[in-house]
């Protein structure tokens, strides 16, 4: 998971 969980799917 990235810290900006909005884009963490790509």
UniProtKB/Swiss-Prot annotation:
Keywords: Hydrolase. Its EC number is 3.1.3.2. The keyword S-adenosyl-L-methionine does not apply. Activated slightly by Co(2+), Ca(2+) and Mg(2+). Strongly inhibited by NaF, Fe(3+) and Al(3+), less so by tartrate, Cu(2+) and Hg(+). Not affected by EDTA, Fe(2+) and Zn(2+). GO terms for biological process: dephosphorylation. It catalyses: a phosphate monoester + H2O = an alcohol + phosphate. The keyword Hydrolase applies. This is Acid phosphatase. It comes from Schizophyllum commune (Split gill fungus).
